[in-house]
Structure formats: C-alpha cells, structure tokens
Swiss-Prot record:
Source species, domain of life: Archaea
GO biological process: translation
The organism of origin for this protein: Methanosphaera stadtmanae (strain ATCC 43021 / DSM 3091 / JCM 11832 / MCB-3)
Name of the molecule in the record: Small ribosomal subunit protein eS8
Keywords recorded for this protein, A-Z: Ribonucleoprotein, Ribosomal protein
One Gene Ontology term, aspect cellular component: ribonucleoprotein complex
Record gene name: rps8e
Length: 126
C-alpha cells in the first residue's frame, strides 16, 4: 500500500470531512531508507523535478572530522551507540542524522543525512 501524505480525512471532532479534490501523485511518499551498518549498498531514486537522490541503504565507512586539528579521516563504523530519532534504531544498527556511532578512532556524531545523500559524514566527539 502506498504512503499518502495528504491532509487527514477526519475533522478534529472525529467527523468525516468532505474532500474537494482527489488524491494527487504529488502527495505520495516513500518508505524511509533506514540506513544500516554493513557492506555498502546504495540505491538511486528519481525525486520530484527529475532530480536524483542516492539512498545509502547499507553503509560501512564514515568521513570523520576532528575539530581539534580540523583534519578529516575516512574510517569504519563499528556500531550505533545512541540514536535520538528512535531508541529501537540502536539495536537494529540504523543510522540517521544526529546518531552517535562507535568508529575505529572513537565516538562520532553523524551530521549528514545518509538516506537522502548516500554518504555518511560526522564529527568526532569526546
């Protein structure tokens, strides 16, 4: 079944509201990417306006910036430690923007959106 992102068919009182237009293609959405940690898998999708998005469904490496000396390194992610988007994402190893992951060089906070851009960037935290 498709994901419809239009307005509700019910009023705040619970009564059914009468629609003055049909469902449009522009109101349909997609399932979330839910990027996991593992061997790299990327998928290209066509978005609105014939724009393309690269979805990382599985990612293994992260570009980490060290704020002390402003250097960047491409390192491997080990596991998800914390995710503010959903507490169940931690045990499923799903990464989103703002998640804290364990890397080879320490903890890093994800600053990019892997489900939208297909790349994982982060900042090293203490």
């Amino acid at each position: 079944m498709a994901i419809w992102q239009g307005s509700s068919l019910r009023k705040p009182s619970g009564a059914r509201s009468r629609r003055n237009k049909n469902k449009r293609n522009a109101e349909f959405g997609r399932n979330p990417a839910e990027t996991r940690i593992g061997d790299e898998v990327k998928k290209e999708i066509v978005a609105r306006g014939n724009c393309t998005k690269t979805r990382a469904t599985v990612a293994k490496r992260i570009n980490v910036i060290d704020p002390k000396d402003n250097s960047s390194k491409n390192v491997e992610m080990l596991t998800v430690l914390e995710n503010g988007a959903n507490s169940h994402f931690v045990r499923r190893n799903i990464i989103t923007k703002g998640a804290i992951v364990e890397t080879e060089i320490g903890k890093a906070k994800i600053t990019s959106r892997p489900g939208q851009k297909g790349i994982v960037n982060g900042v090293l935290i203490e």
